């Protein structure tokens, strides 16, 4: 696996740590900014909206520069957003910080996943994406608990200062180890490539795959966005125990992502069907027994194993239905974050009238639709397991697998 894939994973880790930090800092943020838990929950929604709307726009703007320049530009924007978050003294200032970091994170995800897919042979794209998305799982495994722990001991501001430092480190690794393609397209080629990238969005199977990703992620984030208050206020765990539980949840997501990444290329349809079905079952169990500590932890870990860990299989499905180009992957990331918007936003709206258990029930509804949305792809052998050669979207100057390496041009 090219070293650049692991560097991109480090970048994903940094982005995800910032994205998820709010979930572990809800009580401190609510007290400091003078708002309720539901308002802090909307910070997750704001981040997701910024990702969905601003991410593709930033990606389009960066199509005219080299991939490494695009990534470094994103790191600068992301760094500025985290500095704003660390120094925020009001809720509006924190909202502004979440908008800036959300836009940057989404563009990074799309460009990074696109590079991963083009760095390797088609038969191991799912595995490469899985390696990069280990940054997502490690962000949950290490980043979220560390942010929660630092926020509890040193104040929530310290968590965002730490993320700013991580951003500098990730940018340095990118500058040192990620290289540009051997040949970059000129302006006419960029226009041709953009036309080709937009054309694939007329494909029904791509649109269905995008919608399916929204439902899969929405099912998990309806619960995950409020996991800390659920564990403390319903399950009865103490504040010192929650970081350990979040660490266990992160370990479950890391394990699940490794397994899914290895199976995603040859068993895409089966992985998605089994994963979404299990996620539905675990959400039902969590909703019923959230107030009983041991079963609550078991079902929480189950959701960690099969929730957001479907990402490598989801990415392979989208790339087969569309293409491996940056815009397709960024739009896919936008549909994923649309699931975050729906899960966290509707969950926040339900809490005042129905309590903290309501977001889990909402997740069950999303999970039912997610299972149904996977079924049509099972009839298509190419989407299900890639049994016929992939047909890439024609584009002038597009890179072929293996054309990017440490020895490519700067």
Give the positions of each predicted feature.
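Helix-breaking motifs and short loop linkers at transmembrane-helix boundaries and internal kinks
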Residues: 34, 66, 87-93, 104, ...
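Conserved MFS/SLC helix-loop-helix module at the cytosolic interface between two early adjacent transmembrane helices
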Residues: 53-92
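Paired small-residue
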Residues: 81-84, 92-101, 294-302
């Amino acid at each position: 696996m090219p070293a650049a894939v692991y560097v991109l994973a480090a970048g994903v880790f940094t982005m995800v740590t910032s994205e998820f930090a709010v979930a572990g800092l809800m009580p401190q943020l609510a007290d400091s900014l003078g708002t309720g838990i539901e308002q802090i929950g909307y910070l997750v929604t704001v981040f997701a909206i910024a990702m969905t709307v601003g991410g593709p726009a930033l990606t389009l703007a960066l199509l005219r520069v080299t991939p490494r320049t695009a990534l470094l530009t994103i790191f600068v924007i992301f760094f500025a957003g985290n500095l704003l978050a660390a120094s925020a003294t009001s809720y509006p200032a924190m909202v502004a910080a979440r908008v800036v970091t959300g836009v940057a994170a989404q563009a990074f995800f799309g460009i990074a996943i696109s590079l991963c897919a083009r760095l390797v042979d088609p038969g191991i794209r799912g595995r490469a994406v899985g390696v990069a998305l280990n940054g997502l799982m490690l962000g949950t495994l290490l980043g979220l608990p560390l942010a929660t722990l630092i926020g509890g001991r040193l104040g929530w501001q310290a968590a965002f200062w730490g993320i700013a430092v991580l951003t500098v480190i990730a940018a340095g690794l990118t500058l040192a180890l990620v290289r540009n393609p051997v040949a970059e397209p000129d302006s006419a080629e960029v226009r041709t490539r953009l036309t080709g990238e937009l054309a694939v969005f007329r494909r029904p199977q791509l649109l269905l795959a995008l919608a399916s990703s929204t439902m899969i992620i929405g099912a998990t984030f309806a619960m995950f966005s409020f996991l800390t208050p659920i564990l403390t206020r319903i399950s009865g765990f103490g504040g010192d125990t929650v970081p350990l539980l979040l660490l266990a949840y992160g370990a479950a997501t890391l394990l699940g992502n490794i397994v899914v990444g290895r199976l995603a290329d040859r068993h895409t349809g089966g992985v998605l069907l089994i994963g979404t079905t299990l996620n539905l079952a675990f959400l039902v169990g969590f909703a019923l027994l959230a107030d009983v500590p041991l079963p609550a932890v078991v079902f929480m870990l189950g959701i960690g194993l099969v929730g957001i860990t479907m990402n490598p299989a989801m990415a392979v499905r989208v790339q087969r239905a569309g293409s491996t180009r940056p815009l397709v992957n960024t739009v896919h990331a936008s549909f994923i974050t649309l699931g975050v918007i729906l899960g966290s936003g509707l969950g926040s709206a339900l809490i005042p009238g129905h309590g903290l258990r309501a977001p889990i029930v909402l997740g069950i509804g999303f999970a039912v639709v997610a299972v149904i949305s996977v079924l049509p792809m099972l009839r298509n052998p190419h989407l299900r397991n890639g049994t016929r050669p992939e047909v890439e979207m024609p584009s002038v100057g597009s890179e072929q697998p293996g054309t990017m390496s440490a020895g490519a041009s700067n």
